[in-house]
From Swiss-Prot:
<comment type="subunit">
    <text>Homotetramer.</text>
</comment>
<keyword id="KW-0788">Thiol protease</keyword>
<keyword id="KW-0378">Hydrolase</keyword>
<dbReference type="GO" id="GO:0016920">
    <property type="term" value="F:pyroglutamyl-peptidase activity"/>
</dbReference>
<dbReference type="GO" id="GO:0005829">
    <property type="term" value="C:cytosol"/>
</dbReference>
<dbReference type="GO" id="GO:0006508">
    <property type="term" value="P:proteolysis"/>
</dbReference>
<dbReference type="InterPro" id="IPR029762">
    <property type="entry name" value="PGP-I_bact-type"/>
</dbReference>
<dbReference type="InterPro" id="IPR036440">
    <property type="entry name" value="Peptidase_C15-like_sf"/>
</dbReference>
<comment type="similarity">
    <text>Belongs to the peptidase C15 family.</text>
</comment>
<dbReference type="InterPro" id="IPR016125">
    <property type="entry name" value="Peptidase_C15-like"/>
</dbReference>
<feature type="active site">
    <location>
        <position position="167"/>
    </location>
</feature>
<feature type="active site">
    <location>
        <position position="143"/>
    </location>
</feature>
<feature type="active site">
    <location>
        <position position="80"/>
    </location>
</feature>
<comment type="function">
    <text>Removes 5-oxoproline from various penultimate amino acid residues except L-proline.</text>
</comment>
<keyword id="KW-0645">Protease</keyword>
<dbReference type="InterPro" id="IPR033693">
    <property type="entry name" value="PGPEP1_Glu_AS"/>
</dbReference>
<protein>
    <recommendedName>
        <fullName>Pyrrolidone-carboxylate peptidase</fullName>
        <ecNumber>3.4.19.3</ecNumber>
    </recommendedName>
</protein>
């Protein structure tokens, strides 16, 4: 049976929950067209997160890897276009590490583009009435670290696995502690991720529609 690996993070930065894991764990063992979804939690720690991700890939042998992370302040489902080869942590990770201007992979490429049909995914999620967009930056914290490490692995192994990263907003119960911050219900995010998985599995060539940014 084919499998999809979907990951979320443990809480970080003083939050009591991480919406990525709260949502992702609901998809564990979900069946989609004969494909089984397997959920795994990653530590919010440089290095350790990639170790856990690589172990999960080796174990599950998925055809698709979707890494999900929290982006407090964003209002929609943000599907990442690119990961860059730098760790530049504004805050320490959960193990107290705070790399500044360090490459994720020494002598690795400056960036990798996603292996997901991101515009088709955005279009499908929007058609379901859920806000979504293509994001041009995954940041320089553990989320970007995981996305770059994932795509580097897939590039190095010439693997046909599809892979990429999606950022999601705060949950409403988090947003009450961040006045003015947008949020999205876990129910809406689950629907969006189910659609993202389905579209990524079905589509090999992305939609030719605008998804860029002015700034």
């Amino acid at each position: 049976m084919k499998s999809v690996l979907i990951t979320g993070f443990e809480p970080f930065g003083g939050e009591r929950v991480n919406p990525s894991w709260e949502v992702v764990k609901q998809l564990n063992d979900f069946m989609l067209g004969g494909v089984k979804v397997v959920a795994r939690q990653l530590p919010c720690a440089f290095g350790e997160a990639l170790t856990a991700l690589n172990a999960a890939i080796d174990e599950i042998q998925p055809v698709l890897v979707l890494a999900i992370g929290q982006a407090g302040g964003r209002a929609d489902i943000s599907i990442e276009r690119v990961a860059i080869n730098v760790d530049d942590a504004r805050i320490a990770d959960n193990l107290g590490n705070q790399p500044i201007d360090q490459p994720i992979v020494e002598n690795g490429p400056a960036a990798y583009f996603t292996r997901l049909p991101i515009k088709a995914m955005v279009q499908g999620i929007r058609e379901a009435g859920i806000p979504a967009s293509v994001s041009q930056t995954a940041g320089t914290y553990v989320c970007n670290h995981v996305m770059y490490g994932l795509l580097h692995r897939l590039h190095q192994t010439n693997d046909e696995i599809k892979g990429g990263f999606i950022h999601i907003p705060y949950l409403p119960e988090q947003a009450v502690n961040h006045p003015g911050a947008p949020s999205m219900s876990a129910h809406s995010v689950v629907i969006a991720l189910e659609l993202a998985i389905s579209i990524a599995l079905q589509i090999d060539h992305d939609s030719h529609i605008a998804g860029g940014a002015i700034h």
